[in-house]
Design a protein with these regions (language model features):
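Acidic, low-complexity proline/glycine-rich segments
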Residues: 1-10
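An amphipathic alpha-helical core segment
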Residues: 113-163, 168-178
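Protein-protein interaction regions
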Residues: 179-182, 187-188
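Short Gly/Ser/Thr- and charged-rich N-terminal loops/segments
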Residues: 87
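Alpha-helical scaffold segments that form or flank carboxylate-/histidine-based iron centers
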Residues: 16-32, 50-71, 137-150
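Secretory/endomembrane lumenal or extracellular ectodomains immediately following the signal peptide
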Residues: 12-14
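Alpha-helical transition-metal enzyme core signature, strongest for iron centers
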Residues: 27-38, 62-76, 100, 104, ...
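Conserved, well-structured core segments that form or line functional sites
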Residues: 81-82, 91-121, 129
């Protein structure tokens, strides 16, 4: 049985960048619905490891709801209140970003462009091999995601309406770079 993870911060902790009402609905309604629907769909015979299940199943409803649960569970970990966020990548992560993208600003520009270019609902990811990947709907990226941005409208519409660019700019203020570094290092 899959469970809704608790947020690693209070629902108001990401203000003013991501508002309380959005967090309450995003986590407590959208993510909770993915978990409930997934539990209604899986059987005792199904793979218990969610990532493996999503990679092997042909059941589109399991992929949609399981992907929603998996992606959001990662997403919450990758966020932190602005006061707790280091504000930028450091250490090995920063070295790899600099080597791949020239510098942190170059990475942010490319990641933001991918997020703005994602037509419709989906996600943008940075994978462990430092590839920026956008996926439709609740699909998982190829590779191991270390940073993800939800660009479904439910993630930002209450505060930002149709201004996805403003949401993305605000989101950079609450990225939990320490968590991204720990995922990269495999110490999650």
């Amino acid at each position: 049985m899959f469970t809704l993870p608790e947020l690693p911060f209070a629902t108001n902790a990401l203000e003013p960048f991501i508002d309380t009402q959005t967090m309450e609905i995003h986590h407590g309604k959208h993510h909770a619905a993915y978990v409930k629907n997934l539990n209604d769909l899986v059987t005792d015979k199904d793979e218990k490891d969610l990532e493996n299940l999503l990679r092997i199943t042909d059941n589109q409803k399991i992929k949609n709801n399981g992907g929603g649960h998996y992606n959001h569970s990662l997403f919450w970990q990758m966020l932190a209140p602005h006061s707790a966020s280091s504000g930028q990548a450091e250490g090995k992560l920063l070295e790899m970003i600099n080597s791949t993208f020239g510098n942190l600003d170059g990475f942010k520009e490319k990641f933001t462009a991918a997020a703005l270019g994602r037509f419709g609902s989906g996600w943008v990811w940075l994978t462990k091999d430092l590839k920026i990947v956008d996926t439709p709907n609740q699909d998982l990226p190829e590779g191991t995601p270390i940073l993800g941005l939800d660009v479904w409208e439910h993630a930002y519409y209450l505060k930002y309406q149709n201004r996805r660019a403003d949401y993305i700019t605000a989101w950079w203020n609450v990225v939990n770079w320490k968590k991204v570094e720990s995922i990269l290092s495999g110490s999650v």
